[in-house]
Amino acid sequence: LAHGIFAPVLPEIVSADGLAALIAVEDAPDPVRRLASLLPADSDRAGAVAKRLKLSKLTTKRLVLAAGRRPADAENPRALAYRIGLEGAVDRLMLGSQAAAFAELDGWAVPTFPLSGGAIVARGIKAGPEVARLLQASEAQWVAEGFPDAARVEQIADEVVRAAV
């Protein structure tokens, strides 16, 4: 970096501090995560780098997700993993030097929302956009409560439907 060898290919790299911090916490080297550590936390710029380097669609998506990191990611790591995927959440937390939050994902599997639109219709709501809205509200509450069991999800759905009627 000091000799400018990356400048022709990756002028976005201005510091190796992020890479040094990542190396200190990673168990095994990950090339995509290491590249992300060298880039600014800017999804648009990461997308431009991925295009210039002709990365695969999957790698581009991962790099762009990692570049979207922000301090708020550590507030609810499991909600982050549910929203963007476990790998994306791990990338963001490791790149943000948020090891304590990263530890919360160790051994955790992203759950599947146990409710469908049919469960909302069964509660007396006519099929249509309102069902989707109520299902999304139920899912948001489920995530906010830390992914409670199916019995609590049923209660959440009842509460959401009751509030809408």
Regions found by a protein language model. Name each.
Residues D91-V165:
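Charged substrate- and nucleic-acid-binding regions of tRNA-handling and nucleotidyl-transfer enzymes
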